[in-house]
Swiss-Prot record:
A Pfam family matched in the record: IGPS
Alphabetized UniProt keyword annotations: Amino-acid biosynthesis, Aromatic amino acid biosynthesis, Decarboxylase, Lyase, Tryptophan biosynthesis
Pathway assignment: Amino-acid biosynthesis; L-tryptophan biosynthesis; L-tryptophan from chorismate: step 4/5
Disulfide bond entries: none
Catalytic activity line of the entry: 1-(2-carboxyphenylamino)-1-deoxy-D-ribulose 5-phosphate + H(+) = (1S,2R)-1-C-(indol-3-yl)glycerol 3-phosphate + CO2 + H2O
HAMAP family: IGPS_B
Protein name as catalogued: Indole-3-glycerol phosphate synthase
Alphabetized InterPro entries for the sequence: Aldolase_TIM (IPR013785), Indole-3-glycerol_P_synth (IPR045186), Indole-3-glycerol_P_synth_dom (IPR013798), Indole-3-GlycerolPSynthase_CS (IPR001468), RibuloseP-bd_barrel (IPR011060)
Entry's Gene Ontology molecular function annotations: indole-3-glycerol-phosphate synthase activity; phosphoribosylanthranilate isomerase activity
GO biological process, one term: L-tryptophan biosynthetic process
PROSITE patterns: IGPS (PS00614)
Species of origin: Prochlorococcus marinus (strain NATL1A)
Length: 295
C-alpha cells in the first residue's frame, strides 16, 4: 500500500499577484494518507513554536529512559500488556467522553499493565504531547509515544515529553527513513516499536535488520476491519527469522478479552497492545486486571 507525501501546490503570477493552482493529486487517497499529509502541517507549526535546540536543552535535564523491551520480556503475565490511552480514533470517533489521561494511566499501572502507549496525534486522535507529559508525571512504567512519525523532530518531541519508546509505521516510511529514524531514536535512548500490516512490510523490516521490537497490526488500512488471522499468518510464516533475531512480537488491534490474548499468544505474540476495548469500559481498572489474569 503506497502512502504518498503531500504534493506541493504550484502557483502562477498575474501582475503582482500570486495564485495557487490545485495539484491534480491534491486529495489524499485514504485515511492514512490524509493523516500523513496533515502531519506535515502539524510538524511545521510545532517547529515554529519550539525549536529543535529547545527540545535538545530540555532532554539534557531528563532522567535516562526506561527499558521498554525488558518490561515486556520480564512480564509475569503472558502475553505482556501494553495498554493504550486514546480519546478518539478515525474509525470510532470519540471513544471516551470522560477522558482523564492521568487517571487512566494510573489505573493501567495499578491493574498490571507492563507498559503504556499514549496517542499524541491531535487532529485524528485528539491526543497531544501535553497528554504524554501529564501521564509521565503519574506513572513509573515505560511509555510508548504513538504517533505518525515522519521526521527526527518528532522523536525529539517524544523524548522531551517523557517517552521511553516511539512507534514507526512501515507503511508510511521508506527503508531509508526507517534506518535513519532508528539511529536518531538510538541516540535519544528511545526504543522503537516498528509496525507492519502485511508480509511485504514485515520482510522490509526484517531485511533492514535493526529492529528487535515489531508490532503486527491486525487492522486493514483500507477497510479498518480487524482480523487476528493477520498475526497468525505473519508470525507463522516468519517464525524462524523472528526467533533467530530475538525479536519481541506485539499483536495490535482487534483484541478485546483474555481469550483473544491467549489466541495471539498461541500464534507467537509475546505482547499485545490494547486500546479501544479498555478505553470503552466503565471499569478500566477491572478491565486491565481481567486481561492480565488478576481478576
Amino acid at each position: 500500500m503506497e502512502i504518498r507525501r503531500r504534493p506541493p501546490n504550484p502557483s502562477i503570477k498575474v501582475a503582482n499577484l500570486e495564485y495557487a493552482i490545485p495539484h491534480p493529486d491534491s486529495k489524499p487517497k485514504n485515511i492514512l494518507e490524509e493523516i500523513v499529509w496533515e502531519k506535515h502541517l502539524e510538524v511545521e507549526i510545532a517547529r515554529k513554536k519550539v525549536s529543535l535546540e529547545d527540545l535538545k536543552k530540555k532532554i539534557k535535564d531528563l532522567p535516562k529512559t526506561k527499558n521498554f523491551i525488558d518490561a515486556l520480556r520480564n512480564s509475569n503475565s503472558k502475553p505482556a500488556l501494553i495498554s493504550e490511552i486514546k480519546k478518539a480514533s478515525p474509525s470510532r470517533g470519540i471513544i471516551r467522553e470522560d477522558f482523564d489521561a492521568k487517571m487512566i494511566g494510573k489505573m493501567y499501572q495499578e491493574g498490571g499493565a507492563n507498559c503504556i502507549s499514549v496517542l499524541t496525534d491531535k487532529k485524528f486522535f485528539q491526543g497531544g504531547f501535553d497528554v504524554l507529559v501529564e501521564v509521565r508525571k503519574e506513572i513509573i512504567i515505560p511509555i510508548l509515544c504513538k504517533d505518525f512519525i515522519l521526521y527526527p523532530y518528532q522523536l525529539y518531541q517524544a523524548r522531551a515529553a517523557g517517552a521511553d519508546a516511539a512507534l514507526l509505521i512501515a507503511a508510511i516510511l521508506t527503508d531509508s527513513d526507517l534506518k535513519y529514524l532508528s539511529k536518531v531514536a538510538e541516540h535519544l535512548g528511545l526504543t522503537i516499536l516498528v509496525e507492519v500490516h502485511d508480509s511485504e512490510e514485515l520482510e522490509r523490516v526484517l531485511n533492514i535488520n535493526v529492529f528487535n521490537l515489531i508490532g503486527i497490526n491486525n487492522r486493514n488500512l483500507k477497510s479498518f476491519k480487524t482480523d487476528l488471522e493477520v498475526t497468525k499468518k505473519l508470525a507463522k510464516n516468519y517464525a524462524n527469522q523472528i526467533k533467530e533475531n530475538s525479536i519481541t512480537l506485539v499483536s495490535e488491534s482487534g483484541l478485546f478479552n483474555r481469550e483473544d490474548l491467549d489466541l495471539v499468544k498461541s500464534y507467537g505474540a509475546d505482547a499485545v497492545l490494547v486500546g479501544e476495548s479498555l478505553m470503552s469500559q466503565e471499569d478500566i481498572l477491572g478491565g486491565v486486571k481481567k486481561l492480565v489474569g488478576n481478576l
